[in-house]
């Protein structure tokens, strides 16, 4: 998927030399405020998006390893718990909260020119996704406490039930956060904002507009009991959304937002060169 998107990324290579040559000149609007640097904003956004992958995937793997569980069957297994893996995963998950909130905040001043309502909606979606991530962190830390109590000679039956409850809470927080809210926020809302604004190639943004609803459909099927989260169909239906987010992060980190975007031109239209 990433290889197939490389021609899109190269579309606006022409003219980049001129952009770099003029980069030393600062744009000042009629109000005296500096004009938004769309390329720089896009690159920050891209690196933050890559940061969500760098933190979320290892955190998930560490949680599964720390619980002694599997991707589709997350539960508390007494004797197989690794506190070190769970604690390190919790730290990475907190990093995920920081990076995903950053992706929404860093572009707000720019994309609100396209639609302030949708820009605020994206911030709200990222905040809600972060809330589910925080619930997951608390659940995992609680599992560590249960494992410690079990090692100290506590009631094995009662503590196993408690540990399974916390593990189940984490799994459902994961399902509602990355499994549903991400499809709404990153897929539908962000995909539409990128498509309408032209900050990235429209063909790339279309992947988000397709991947978001597909991920939402997968969430509904899991709720209906069609399959478990992490099983074959779940992974397949997650691919379009994951491909959209990863390609968006790589493209923006590499090239930034397109300066010929209509909202970028709106920002710079009253500007004068110094």
Spans of features found by a protein language model:
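Hydrophobic, aromatic-enriched alpha-helical segments typical of multi-pass transmembrane helices
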Residues: 7-274
């Amino acid at each position: 998927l990433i290889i197939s998107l490389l021609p899109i990324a190269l579309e606006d290579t022409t003219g980049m030399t001129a952009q770099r040559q003029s980069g030393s000149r600062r744009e000042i609007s009629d109000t005296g405020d500096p004009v938004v640097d769309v390329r720089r904003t896009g690159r920050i956004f891209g690196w933050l998006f890559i940061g969500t992958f760098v933190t979320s995937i290892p955190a998930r793997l560490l949680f599964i390893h720390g619980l002694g569980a599997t991707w589709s069957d997350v539960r508390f297994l007494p004797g197989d718990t690794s506190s070190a893996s769970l604690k390190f995963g919790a730290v990475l998950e907190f990093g995920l909260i920081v990076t995903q909130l950053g992706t929404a905040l860093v572009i707000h001043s720019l994309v609100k020119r396209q639609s302030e309502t949708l820009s605020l909606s994206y911030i709200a979606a990222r905040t809600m996704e972060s809330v589910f991530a925080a619930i997951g962190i608390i659940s995992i830390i609680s599992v560590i406490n249960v494992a410690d109590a079990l090692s100290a000679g506590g009631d094995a039956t009662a503590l196993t039930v408690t540990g399974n409850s916390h593990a189940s809470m984490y799994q459902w927080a994961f399902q509602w956060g990355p499994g549903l809210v991400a499809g709404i926020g990153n897929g539908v809302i962000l995909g539409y904002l990128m498509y309408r604004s032209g900050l990235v190639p429209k063909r790339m943004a279309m992947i988000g507009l397709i991947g978001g609803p597909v991920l939402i459909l997968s969430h509904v099927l899991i709720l209906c009991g069609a399959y478990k989260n992490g099983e074959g169909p779940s992974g397949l239906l997650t691919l379009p959304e994951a491909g959209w987010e990863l390609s968006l992060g790589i493209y923006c980190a590499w090239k930034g937002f397109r300066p010929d975007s209509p909202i970028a031109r709106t920002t710079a239209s009253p500007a004068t060169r110094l």
